[in-house]
A protein has these predicted regions:
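Conserved, structured core segments of small domains
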Residues: 1-103
Length: 103
């Protein structure tokens, strides 16, 4: 167990929450661009785990392969955040490199 704990790495956990604007029809194109950006961040290894959540309180969670400050800066540039469609929380966390969601 000590060996495994010593392999832990710092990541950032993001919780994405919708604002009332999320539910407006004219927000759909911006939400689409938000999703495209997330896929690009995932492909680049910056946001390796992305989990959309389908309820009214949380839109999604993800793990950033960065520290919390860098994750905040990345999310501040998100088109949905900039448009006031989403708000987010960032929490520093630790995990084990190579962990993944099961196929």
């Amino acid at each position: 167990m000590h060996h495994r704990i010593n392999q832990a790495k710092t990541y950032a956990l993001m919780v994405l929450k919708p604002t009332p604007k999320y539910f407006e029809a004219d927000s759909r194109p911006i939400v689409w661009e938000h999703g495209r950006r997330n896929m690009a961040l995932q492909a680049a290894g910056i946001m390796p785990i992305v989990c959309p959540v389908g309820d009214e309180q949380i839109s999604g969670i993800c793990i950033f392969n960065t520290d919390a400050d860098e994750a905040r800066a990345i999310m501040a540039e998100d088109p949905g955040v900039r448009a006031g469609i989403f708000i987010f929380e960032i929490h520093g966390c630790r995990g084990f490199p190579g962990d993944a969601l099961p196929a």
